[in-house]
Amino acid sequence: MDIYEAASQGRIDAIKFAVEQGCDVDGPNEDGKTPLWFAVQSGQPEACRFLMSLGAGRGPQNPSLLEVAVGGGYADIVALLWPHCNAEREHRSLKTAISLGFHEIADFLIETGAFEYQDSEVSGTESLIEDGSPERESTVFQQWERFLFVRRGQKLPLHRVFFDYALLLATKAGRNAGLRLVEFLLGESMPDVNCKIMINGQFETPLTAAAEKGNLEILATLIDHPNIDLTICGKYNWPAFLHLLASPLSISTERGRVIARRLAYKAVYNRLFIDSREIRLQGAFQNVLRFGDDGLVKQVIDLVRGAAGTLILPLLIRANEVDGLTWVLNCDGVSSKKPPPAFWVLLCQYFKRYQDQDALGLFTSVTEFLVEKKIWNQAILKCLHACNFSFIQQFFYPLSEAPPKEVTEETLSPGFENLLFSNADLNGSDPHPNGLGRLELEIIPHAFFDDPSSAAQKISLRSALPSASPNPSNPHLYSYQMELIRLEQQNKRRLFFAGDTRCPLSWAAKSHNAPLVNALLRSPQVNVNFQDPSDRTPLLYAIAVNDRPIVERLLNHRDIDLNLRDAEGRTAIFYAAQGGDLSIVQLLIGTQNVDFSIRNKNGKNVKEFAKKAKLKQDIVAALSN
């Protein structure tokens, strides 16, 4: 047994033996822990006393032995260690005692009078802030509330930094739960309402913490305080205004927007609210685009200006800020971070709800520039000219990223419904692969695949452009072409080139696109038994990818033919057997329309094929029965 294990178990005889064998009574192990630390951590007061009598614990300890003892609730060990502690370095221990509910230990520490820091120099109290405070669960404020309310009316000999910490914990509690403690602390003038506390290497303040949590009631109380500084910055060096905007649903209500407007202010020029490692403004900008009104959008622009780089482009467009937009696009030093697709989707949803011709004209100007520079897909401009804000949303997502369900659902209606019941041929591949108006699928990029700030892409934006152009001469053909692009964009594959010979139904079946299969089967123009040059039908494609729901949907079609053969002579039952999905085999057999006499090009029927190929026994048995 080594000295560390002996200390942990409180074995004084073993500790003595280890020391006699030459062990260092204060020597750390490979993790930097001393024998005294193990005795404290395990709650062994006699072992602690014996080790200290041998000189242990004289040097600095990391972590603090007192904080370890407090964290375990060992009051007797706290009393033993206290005479050897430096109070200015033990403020975390007192915070821990109150936070964990060990209030008797907290009373013992406070009664020493050492935590009032009356004799401290200014630099000493600053060290309390720089040392930082422990991060705690959001419910810890309740322990501080109980501790302070029970001692209400007493003059606690504590330095202000402890009340500052209590105020911060109260503002960080979820759903305004800490409001009563906030009002009590401010009413008693205990804390500094503008205090800064280091948590996990980041400065936090009560105002910014409440904003980050979206605690509107607490925010209103803090804003009304006569000494509040609305420009003070906390985590990420952000003011409360940005933290509130980034909080989910914080500005979804009018009250939230009112408080956001009260928090807003104009920053000094060149003030950066982001660092070089990570753009943190996406959540704030997304909420503003979704819930903010024009005034709030402009307040964000006034605060952030060019510090967000291209990330702010959708906000500038919506606010019709021509000068700011021109500066961002022309600035060589602008951040190359691209706005996420959701920003552009929210901007399109804004145009769908409101007839903002000025902002739409500016959007068109920007789109023309980006299309001309081959930064954006030409389909975006076509959709803008047609004011088709539902259809346009898909094109802002890269091919490697499937658009959200709400985006793809909108593109199916109403244009696609019209297409289904038109006279267009929906069974062949693209009927006009090289015709006029055909978009070149080979060069469809992500909306921002390149940085528009290079010198070769300087622009001068007009304040407004006409937002509409003549409709396509053949709307059905135009819709069909656009839908083909939507399909390849949504499913991240470019299958509708001129050389692609699959019909849309086969493609949808193979791509597991059940909504599109259902939509196509509603059209009288769709041939459910269409065979491509390899004689494969949509049913064969669905079975090949083991998509049982789509197979079942196709089998329910009144015109389905289960016994069509591909170029190798294989029917649907061959595909199902080879695919190894017993449920699909049983589904086909259950129709009672399977022709088991059909032979493939090798002269084998499906039962003979299954035995020769040594397929699963359950498959062979199902076919034999």
UniProtKB/Swiss-Prot annotation:
One family name in Pfam for this protein: Ank_2
The protein's annotated pathway: Secondary metabolite biosynthesis
ANK repeats: 1-27, 31-60, 62-89, 90-119, 162-195, 202-232, 500-530, 534-562, 568-598
Key words, A-Z: ANK repeat, Repeat
Matching InterPro entries: Ankyrin_rpt, Ankyrin_rpt-contain_sf
Gene3D superfamilies tied to this protein: Ankyrin repeat-containing domain
PROSITE patterns: ANK_REP_REGION, ANK_REPEAT
Function statement: Ankyrin repeat domain-containing protein; part of the gene cluster that mediates the biosynthesis of oryzines, natural products with an unusual maleidride backbone. The two subunits of the fungal fatty acid synthase oryfasA and oryfasB probably form octenoic acid. This fatty acid is most likely activated by the acyl-CoA ligase oryP to give octenyl-CoA before the citrate synthase-like protein oryE catalyzes condensation with oxaloacetate to form tricarboxylic acid.
Designated name of the protein: Ankyrin repeat domain-containing protein oryK
Species this protein is from: Aspergillus oryzae (strain ATCC 42149 / RIB 40)
Lineage, uppermost ranks: Eukaryota, Fungi, Dikarya, Ascomycota, Pezizomycotina
